[in-house]
Curated annotation (Swiss-Prot):
Residues 125-820 are annotated as: C-terminal DC effector domain. Residues 1-17 form the signal peptide. A motif (HVLVXXP motif) lies at residues 112-117. It comes from the Eukaryota. Belongs to the Crinkler effector family. Residues 58-111 are annotated as: DWL domain. Secreted effector that suppresses plant basal defense and promotes plant susceptibility via targeting promoters of host HSP gene and thus inhibiting their expression. CRN108 binds directly to heat shock elements (HSEs) 5'-GAAnnTTC-3' and interferes with the association of the HSE with the plant heat shock transcription factors, which initializes HSP gene expression in response to stress. Residues 18-55 are annotated as: LQLFLAK domain. This is Crinkler effector protein 108.
Length: 820
């Protein structure tokens, strides 16, 4: 047997002894200490005691050292391995030697073990003030005694006072620190409406002291980077106040208006370090950051956390942090308080999908606090990815509310002055970080400079800036593969309804993972959405045939940056689909997703190759025929449509279809070749497409027994049944059909560039103009403005024939009235 002398850290008084066998374990020693002091360690499990060998620099501490209390355990060896034998950790009978009687009488007898006692939580007995709720001073009477003069120890009482003196109530710093933090907040009404019912249920359950998880909603803001998660958390008090007002519960409304907000983050200044601050207490990663918000001097985060960790006698969990705030504000009962706890950047925590990982344990601790908090607490957590959240809560009935930041209406936060600016704002797809990036770029230039700037150069510079902001997308090996880009593009164009954890096409990428890159959204109806500017970068990476790259990239540039006639735009959109679905059988309804069709069940379309766009020089019949050798002539020569590699734009003012091409269908088990004809119809304001008008357009453009016919118009349409293989894209279907291309489609309805005001770069990018013609136009208009087409023809093309004359006829002149 060995006799060990022990003392409690932070407690002044005499040491006490326990008898154990030197072959016993550390766990046995904890049991012996607990048994020796049953009153002092009341309600504390033996395994929660922390033991240290009381030897510093090879010398035992003495009874005299511990009589006034010991607080500093720096440099002492902690006995952490519960199975370790006492003789193996320096506590054998041989090592723990006795001293003579005189040494003992003088108080110089050795103390072998120091005991650190974890503090009890939430003592709520009547008569116990707030200060004593966080360490039970009644169980340790010496804790209430003032420190003795000259003593170097810090009792829990002293640590408590020191901590309180270093803190004060402070409103949280904004989690969103970027340039968009002051933009008017959008979508508040919709979000508040989503919160009304769960907030009211949570409050009622808290008031009735019902801790059932199904009544207490954890609010989860889940969306990709740069979409407004941090901004939503900054706005959370306003959202909760709006929701409470709608609940018609006066007390709830008053509580939310007077709520204290804690905003903690695992990014920026208090970023996660790859491991929890305390493996045994995941709450500390939240509560320490809450207290950091209250710090008067705001020291370095790591230094602050280290200071809190040194207060071993104070168990500073989330409830304790709220109790400290109550003490600072002079609130006598925590139940009178309302707290909104916002936790940003959970995805930064270590996550391996297990219940022992940091992500799971921290989220679980927040939920545990939410369900049993003495104060009325609302908890909101954000992350860029949802799958680990679902895994963490998969076995729990915890009620959860998913909040998605709404797309921004870019023109409301970023005023524009030029046509290219307006288009670029649309291209950001309502993503906050993308709009901030664009705003910074545009701020360096005046309106005149922007109007003279090459749109191609401007677009590329904006893309370069976005690459820095969204590095994960552009550096990802996934997006280096052209076939992956094609699968993603097809997923967007198809308007297919995805579940969050569905895979994209034939890739291993899930919708949730794709969304976590940023610039992608998973819409409310399950559709995959993407900012147009990213869509352009995806299209640039599409697999293309040899010799087709320059042709497609030039076509893409003109479509993205230059005004085009509506039929030119629709032809490009159809071309993109031919590349996205190349060699992939797909339902005709999915190929033309968003359009309204008649009977097309069991019809599959296969694009055998990607297509190019050609323009016929004359008006051609667009109905299919048995003659597979039919050739049409454009400026580049003959075109054989039976090769199924072209989209033909018909000659000007054609009475038949505006676009046509030969397609391969499979109807049931039968393979069929026919024409696909697209008619682009612009109508005067308030005119509608009705059944008779539709039938006339179809009759002159398509073979009614075999061809696929699609009428595309921005006008409204009356309700009528469509014939088999016939489709309609009207005002009701327009946005669904064109998706992220919609703003480009609407732009084609605007008047063409004005010949007297268009910049050199705007003119040269018009199809068929080029540098020489653009320079000639600018030189002539500096002499005198062009009044009308006749004036331009006389001065630029005296013969009034040829390609240039046709191009000039498509421009806008001072005498023209805008024909929208």
């Amino acid at each position: 047997m060995v006799k060990l002398y022990c003392a409690v850290v932070g407690v002044a008084g005499s040491a006490f002894s326990v008898r154990v066998d030197e072959s016993d374990t550390v766990d046995d020693l904890k049991d012996a200490i607990k048994a020796k002091k049953p009153n002092d360690f009341k309600d504390i499990d033996a395994d929660k005691l922390e033991l240290y060998v009381a030897k510093r620099d090879g010398v035992w501490l003495t009874e005299a050292d511990v009589k006034s209390g010991v607080a500093d355990i720096t440099g002492l060896v902690r006995l952490e391995v519960v199975r370790a034998k006492l003789f193996s950790v320096g506590l054998s009978d041989e090592v723990v030697s006795e001293v003579d009687a005189q040494e003992e009488a003088a108080g110089r007898g050795p103390v072998n073990v120091l005991v650190v006692v974890p503090m009890k939580k939430r003592r709520v007995d009547a008569g116990v003030d707030e200060e004593r709720r966080f360490f039970d001073t009644r169980d340790f009477p010496p804790l209430l005694a003032p420190p003795q003069r000259g003593a170097t120890v810090e009792s829990p009482e002293a640590q408590w006072e020191k901590l309180l003196n270093s803190l004060e109530w402070k409103e949280p710093k904004r989690l969103c620190a970027s340039s968009g933090q002051n933009w008017p907040y959008q979508g508040e009404s919709e979000l508040a409406g989503h919160l009304v019912e769960p907030l009211a249920l949570h409050y009622t359950a808290w008031y009735l002291q019902n801790e059932d998880k199904q009544n207490h909603a954890i609010n989860l803001v889940l969306s990709g980077p740069g979409t407004g998660k941090s901004r939503m958390l900054d706005q959370m008090k306003g959202l909760m106040c709006a929701a409470a007002a709608r609940s018609n519960n006066r007390k709830l409304k008053e509580r939310m208006e007077n709520a204290f907000v804690f905003s903690v983050t695992f990014e920026n200044g208090t970023s996660a370090t790859g491991s929890l601050l305390d493996r045994d207490n995941p709450e500390f990663d939240i509560s320490y950051r809450m207290l950091y918000q209250l710090s008067k001097d705001r020291p370095n985060w790591k230094k602050f956390a280290k200071t809190l960790k040194s207060y071993r006698s104070l168990e500073l969990d989330i409830e304790a942090a709220i109790g400290i705030l109550a003490k600072l504000k002079g609130i006598d009962d925590v139940k009178k308080m309302t707290v909104i706890l916002c936790v940003d950047g959970l995805q930064k925590l270590v996550n391996d999908g297990t219940k022992s990982c940091d992500f799971y344990r921290v989220l679980a601790s927040v939920c545990s606090f939410l369900n049993s908090s003495r104060a009325f607490a609302v908890c909101v957590c954000s992350a860029t990815i949802q799958s680990p959240v679902d895994k963490a809560l998969s076995d729990s009935p915890q009620k959860r509310v998913f909040l998605v930041p709404p797309p921004l209406r870019g023109h409301e936060v970023l005023p524009t002055k030029t046509r290219i600016e307006k288009q670029l704002v649309d291209d950001m797809g309502g993503h906050g970080r993308a709009l901030e990036t664009l705003q910074l770029f545009l701020s360096h230039y005046t309106k005149d400079q922007l109007e003279e700037m090459d749109p191609t150069w401007m677009f590329e510079k904006v893309c370069d800036a976005l690459r820095l902001q969204y590095g994960d997308i552009f550096a990802s090996p996934f997006f280096q593969d052209p076939y992956n880009c094609r699968e993603v593009l097809a997923a967007i164009l198809s308007r297919r309804r995805y579940k969050l954890f569905d895979r994209i096409g034939r890739t291993d990428m899930t919708v949730d993972c794709l969304r976590s890159f940023g610039l992608f959204r998973w819409g409310a109806e399950g559709h995959l959405e993407c900012a147009f500017i990213l869509l352009v970068l995806l299209m640039q990476k599409l697999p293309k045939k040899l010799g087709e790259v320059d042709n497609f990239d030039d076509h893409l540039t003109r479509t993205v940056l230059v005004w085009q006639r509506f039929e030119q735009f629709v032809a490009f959109y159809r071309r993109v689909k031919s590349i996205a679905y190349c060699e992939t059988p797909v339902a005709l309804s999915s190929f033309h997703a968003g359009a309204r069709f008649g009977a097309i069940q069991d019809i599959i379309i296969t694009e055998p190759t990607s297509r190019t766009v050609v323009e016929a020089l004359r008006q051609e019949d667009t109905k299919s025929s048995s003659d597979d050798s039919t050739c049409f002539t454009n400026r580049d020569g003959g075109v054989k449509i039976s090769d199924m590699d072209t989209i033909v734009i018909n000659g000007a003012s054609a009475s038949a279809g505006d676009l046509f091409m030969r397609v391969q269908l499979k109807v049931g088990r039968q393979n069929v070749q026919c024409n696909e004809v697209i008619q682009c119809k612009l109508l005067q304001t308030k005119q509608k497409i009705h059944e008779d008008a539709y039938a006339k357009e179809r009759a002159k453009a398509a073979n009614e027994s075999s061809d696929v016919f699609l009428l595309v118009t921005p006008a409204q349409a009356t309700e009528f049944d469509l014939p088999p293989r016939c489709g309609l894209v009207s005002a009701n279907e327009f946005g669904r059909y064109f998706g992220p291309f919609t703003s480009r489609a609407y732009r084609s309805f605007l008047e063409p560039p004005n010949i007297n005001t268009a910049s050199f770069h705007e003119l040269r990018r018009l199809e068929g103009v080029g540098d020489a013609t653009a320079a000639k136009i600018i030189a002539e208009r500096t002499i005198r403005r062009f009044s009308n087409l006749e004036d331009a023809l006389n001065r630029l093309v005296p013969s009034k024939k040829g390609k240039t004359a046709m191009i000039l006829s498509r421009m806008h002149y001072d005498d023209d009235e805008a024909d929208l």
